[in-house]
């Protein structure tokens, strides 16, 4: 029945990886089931037969589908069904999209869909890597025109040792979470989060991962040669060469004059009459070809910018190749919020607001990832007004989620631990004006906002991008690219880090890959630029985190108790903890490992609650004095609660120094009195003395003790 069923097996960084094809999804253009350890991912690639009209880009969609059955979970929603993709799924889709997109024919406009469905997850074998390699295999053996293959790998750094495909335990300890993708010759995608890793170590990790990637690429080529389908012939949507040359001859001087400014708005304003004149002259001759005419002008702008850079060493705004746009940084500009910072670089401006919350406000993650909660959250918003446009706001898209995650990754390594700073932290970056590198401005703005909020970060972090122009063997890098250099260039290499090292990388390419020399130069230039931004602007705005939190931020104290004592703090039906919260006006969160977090507006309320909890979890000590509440009166004495759930007896003879006839002559139910523990018998019963407590306190006052 399955006469085309084939299984191919190889070793990938010491682990077996198998590819099954010809049994499932036989109507897709290319289909493969990837087995990597016990991780299983089904990957399908399909393409439309006809091109889509009226567009000037490849309509490629890449979807990484998380299925909770893959980790033995039932979705928590009312419908018990997977909903919209999680942020992690979106980020995984983008990681696969970036290396495969540049390898499609530039003049192809057919819809292409790549779907990776996660069927099972082995914690030691990352499904994103299985999906990426599976996507490359599916496209390679399909009938879809594509100039691959590529492959990807995870790289870690544990105790100074570079590790390929680290397992779950190693990933927890790793100072580096690096994903590298490449073709047979070049590195084509880098994404990383790191604990201040130096440039040389990062480059070594990239190249070590790339060497393993090349082996997988060679294997995919062998499979393609054996079972690959012939590629279908598509209708080329390349613009007419003669038409472009005619438009170029007529409009190039006008385009040069329009592009030669550092102001995006002026540039756009200058280009409008050029578009108007183009359509007035050519629409009649080329009816229904408006999109192609616009693409000719776009291509002409690209030609002008690239020739300036490669031939004249000239940037559109007149800067040098390593020169950063004018910078500005401000903090504390928004009242009542917990922290705020605004970072401006040329016409790019980002305002970041930091908010501190309790541990219970941490984000709950319902996905296939090992992580279930997140205490640092960074979100990025780029409204239409930031680029002078009008369009409805429909919530964050893939780009916004990706930029937010990059800035989040850059700051996580410098955040204080939960024990040092028991808060949930949320940063929101609002892009006020955009002309390139808004994600890197978000990193800078987040650092400013966190320091303004009084978060004791280990070191300030700055972000900067590096661009690239290539032509044959010629290439040139430039620091701090603005919009047109991003649009018309070949690379956007984003690097966030401290003075000590790198904390985050994201590399976007429009070419087939980079050589080690280009990567090394990009690291060197971004390192120098980061230090300049920190020293000249950010640290002058705020040299160190504020010593105190905002008066509007919740105050927090934490302690650790024996997990076996948790039930005593909570009490029967939660009565004890509810009583503490009500009496002290606090919120209390208790983790399973015994960590206790107490928050309130007033720090003194936190201290009072902590003292009460300590009396609950610590066994009473003979000779110690406690403030207790009288709970019951008996003929022979009074029962006093010295801590929730801990009650002792004050015998009538121990109520006062003088003789007491009736207990009620001295105390009443509800009275707060000082008592001293005089004895704890073998049955755990506590004997108390008010008389001895008073005597001891008076002796202290007189300095006798």
Language model regions located:
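Extended amphipathic alpha-helical scaffolds
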Residues: 1-48, 56, 233-370, 554-568, ...
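Conserved phosphate/anionic-ligand binding catalytic regions in large, soluble enzymes, centered on
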Residues: 30-32, 125-143, 331-354, 435-455, ...
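Glycine-rich, flexible beta-strand/loop modules in the N-terminal catalytic cores of phosphate-handling
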Residues: 28-113, 118-120, 125, 191, ...
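Single-stranded RNA-binding regions, centering on S1/OB-family and related RNA-binding modules
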Residues: 552-558, 563-705
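Flexible, glycine/charged-enriched surface loops at secondary-structure junctions
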Residues: 106-112, 147-149, 216-234, 265-266, ...
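Mobile "lid/hinge" segments at catalytic clefts and subdomain interfaces of large enzymes
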Residues: 143-259, 450-547
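Conserved helix-loop functional segments at active or binding sites
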Residues: 98-106, 141, 333, 358, ...
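Long, basic N-terminal domains or extensions that often function
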Residues: 1-235
């Amino acid at each position: 029945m399955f006469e085309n069923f084939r299984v191919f097996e190889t070793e990938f960084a010491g682990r077996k990886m198998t590819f099954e094809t010809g049994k499932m999804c036989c109507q897709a253009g290319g289909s493969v089931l990837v087995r990597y350890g016990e991780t299983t991912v089904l990957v399908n690639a399909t393409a439309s037969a006809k091109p889509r009209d009226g567009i000037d880009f490849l309509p490629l969609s890449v979807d990484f589908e998380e299925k909770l059955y893959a980790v033995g979970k039932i979705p928590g929603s009312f419908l018990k069904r997977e909903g919209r993709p999680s942020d992690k799924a979106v980020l995984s889709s983008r990681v696969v999209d970036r290396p495969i997109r540049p390898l499609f024919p530039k003049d192809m406009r057919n819809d292409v869909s790549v779907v990776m469905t996660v069927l099972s997850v082995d914690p030691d074998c990352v499904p994103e890597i299985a999906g990426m390699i599976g996507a490359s295999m599916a496209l390679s053996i399909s009938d879809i025109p594509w100039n691959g293959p590529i492959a990807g790998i995870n790289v870690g750094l544990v105790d100074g040792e570079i590790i390929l495909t680290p397992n779950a335990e190693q990933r927890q300890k790793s100072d580096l979470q690096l994903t590298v993708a490449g073709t047979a010759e070049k590195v084509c995608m880098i994404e990383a989060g790191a604990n201040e890793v130096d440039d040389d170590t990062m480059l070594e990790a990239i190249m070590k991962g790339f060497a393993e990637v090349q082996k997988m690429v060679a294997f995919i080529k062998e499979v393609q040669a054996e079972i690959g389908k012939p590629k279908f012939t598509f209708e080329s949507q390349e613009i007419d060469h003669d038409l472009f040359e005619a438009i170029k001859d007529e409009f190039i001087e006008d385009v040069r004059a329009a592009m030669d400014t550092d102001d995006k708005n002026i540039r756009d304003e200058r280009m409008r009459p050029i578009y108007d004149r183009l359509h007035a002259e050519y629409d009649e001759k080329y009816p229904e070809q408006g999109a192609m005419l616009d693409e000719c002008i776009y291509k002409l702008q690209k030609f002008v910018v690239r020739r300036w850079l490669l031939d004249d060493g000239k940037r559109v705004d007149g800067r040098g190749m390593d020169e950063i746009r004018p910078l500005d940084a401000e903090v504390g500009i928004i009242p009542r919020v917990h922290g705020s910072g605004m970072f401006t670089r040329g016409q790019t401006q980002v305002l970041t607001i930091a908010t501190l919350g309790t541990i219970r406000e941490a984000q709950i993650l319902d996905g296939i990832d090992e992580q279930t909660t997140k205490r640092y959250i960074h979100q990025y918003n780029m409204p239409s007004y930031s680029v002078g446009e009008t369009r409805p706001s429909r919530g964050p898209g893939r780009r916004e989620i990706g930029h937010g995650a990059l800035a989040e990754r850059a700051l996580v390594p410098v955040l204080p631990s939960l024990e040092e700073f028991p808060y949930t932290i949320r940063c929101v970056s609002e892009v006020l004006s955009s002309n390139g590198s808004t994600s890197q401005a978000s990193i800078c703005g987040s650092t400013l906002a966190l320091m303004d909020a009084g978060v004791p970060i280990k070191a300030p972090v700055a972000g900067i991008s590096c661009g690239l122009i290539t032509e044959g063997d010629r290439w040139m890098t430039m620091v701090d690219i603005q919009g047109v250099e991003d649009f018309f260039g070949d690379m956007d290499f984003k690097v966030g880090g401290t003075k000590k090292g790198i904390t985050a990388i994201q590399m976007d390419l429009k070419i087939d890959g980079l050589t080690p020399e280009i990567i090394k130069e990009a690291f060197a230039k971004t390192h120098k630029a980061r230090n300049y931004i920190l020293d000249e602007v950010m640290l002058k705005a705020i040299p160190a985190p504020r010593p105190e939190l905002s008066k509007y931020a919740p105050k927090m104290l934490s302690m650790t108790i024996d997990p076996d004592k948790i039930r005593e703090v909570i009490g029967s039906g939660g009565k004890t903890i509810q009583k503490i919260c009500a009496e002290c006006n606090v919120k209390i969160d208790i983790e399973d490992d015994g960590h206790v977090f107490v928050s309130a507006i007033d720090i003194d309320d936190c201290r009072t609650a902590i003292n009460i909890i300590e009396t609950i979890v610590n066994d009473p000590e003979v000779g110690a004095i406690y403030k207790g509440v009288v709970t019951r009166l008996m003929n022979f004495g009074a029962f006093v609660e010295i801590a929730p759930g801990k009650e002792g007896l004050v015998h009538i003879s121990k109520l006062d120094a003088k003789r007491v006839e009736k207990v009620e002559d001295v105390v009443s139910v509800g009275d707060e009195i000082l008592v001293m523990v005089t004895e704890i018998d073998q049955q755990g019963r506590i004997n108390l003395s008010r008389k001895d407590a008073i005597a001891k306190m008076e002796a202290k006052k007189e300095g006798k003790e």
